[in-house]
Amino acid sequence: MTKRSNKRREQAETTKAALFESAITLFNEKGYNSVTIEDIARRAGTAKGSFYTYFRTKGDIIIEEFRAIDDYYKRLEKTLMRFSSALEKIYAFNKAQMKYVRDHVGLEMLKILYSHNIMESGAEKILIDTNRYLHGLIKGLVEEGQREGIFRTDVSADRLALLYTRGHRAVFLDWAISDNAFDLVKDGMEFCSVIMLPALMANAGPRSATR
């Protein structure tokens, strides 16, 4: 590949990133429905037509944000290897996930992500997509716990992963509806310890992963 083509690719990546960051900033400031593509392009310092080179609609920005979240999960998965059991890994994942949503995704963006998936006709239902990296990560941890004899085997790992992610979406949705009326990390960890982990366990009694 020539230097010129490398430079064009770098410029394209820079422009796409600028449009994405501008859109996310504006969505947080003004709300998704109040932002136009022209607003996004102006904020990014590029022509309106450039937007359509990288995105078809504003909704594509939402999909891109989900991909960014999944990229975080990929990085996080590597850090979980330092824990010795699947129970500890899921507990650590849950805590990191809650912190990431609170501190990096943020309340306003979370509202936009959920409302877009619920309200937009024809929108890609990425929140419930079992092909997402998140589902595969949780399924892998459940399978590990089943091999260790810690997690129940009367329900498939795939089904348990589905129920797990559904449960945590409920926590995120409750936080968004309440408009940050409770501590997402604190209550999210309580939900994990009191509800989710006992439901995964091979025995009937609740166990805590805290130390």
For each predicted feature, which ranges?
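An amphipathic alpha-helix signature
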Residues: 20, 91, 95, 135, ...
